[in-house]
Amino acid sequence: GYVNFSSSAEARSEMDWLLGIELTRYASIKAHQFIRIGRCVCPIVAHIVEREKAIKDFVPKPYSAVSSKEETNGETIELTSKRTFEEGHEAEAQALADAFNKAGATVTSVKTERKTVNPGKLFSMSDLQSFACKADKTLSPADVLAATQTLYEGGYVTYPRTNSSYLATNEVVKVDAAIKGLAQNGITGLINKPKSKSIYDDSKIEAHSAITPTGKWPGTLSDAQKTVYECILNRFCAVFCEEDCTVDRTTIVIHCYDEDFTLKGDVQVTPGWRKFEKPSSGDKMLPKLNKGDAININFQLVGKMTTPPKRYTVESLNNWMVAPMRGAEKEDAEYSDEEWKEILSDATICTEATRADTVDRCVKSQYISLKKGVYYGEPAGFQLVEIMDKLGIVLDVPVTVNLSKQL
């Protein structure tokens, strides 16, 4: 076993020397300027530059939507048809709006179910970086890693460089101690859940378990450390909250002409873990409606423009690096590292320990920039991609993922 680890480390070192140092020298000589080439740097920069090109080349096109926004029983109900109309088809859009208004709208179904809402999983480093950078857009992934490392060295949180969202079954005692330590500092309402497979699962841990507070209460912290610690603490409290979070989940179906419109909303019954960590989006309030109720409508044409692709955020770039082969349409999906790992095993850009530092190198090399949590392609990044293309250097996602799997 140890021989294989040693051989893997040696191969990785030699591969990084070949791709990093030798190709950097080669590209720099050919380009007559310093060009940083890296096994993971290049696909990251290329990915962001490709998105930047798509945004710059995007030509917005006008189209029409058909929407109604009227008040019923004291609440505004907004209905928008699934159908849209390209420029020049306004007459068809108006005909649909007229048909909707003539037909009237009626509630055909109201279903309410009491649901238990589960909190998010404990944090891996990538999940923590995504969450913390969304909470404080001045932070970069490297800032989050550095803050977590300092908290770890101070004994306030567990080891940071982990790709797991689970705890080992032999860590039950450690969690008991953390809960006890937090209770001494006024945080109550927590209970250990040793039989929960969504928390304790040895099969989900490769080397290190999820990041958790130790129970040791920190003193003076920097702003970054405070933000990161609160993220870790609140998620831990949410996961081990004794009270369930329950909601009445209502689904209302409204029929108008030839289309069904579905409204969904939650009404909180017991806050549970939401006392510690607010949900990512606010509850949508729905009016009190019964089957057969008439809905006030006034469908009209709404002129809109198609929008360009979104730039990568810290979260969406992290999601992409964890599973870069899964397809762009899934980049914003809220899956944990563990869930992506099951979908596409080992197909990653960088490791959990190196991901933040690699992106930080891209920023310091001025290939990309990070502004308020959003990544931008910079002129040097465009130049890097162009030079690699001219020199026939192929370090795209499939090549990089294949190298990572072999190493």
Predicted regions and their residues:
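Short, exposed interaction patches on small structured surface elements
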Residues: 389-390
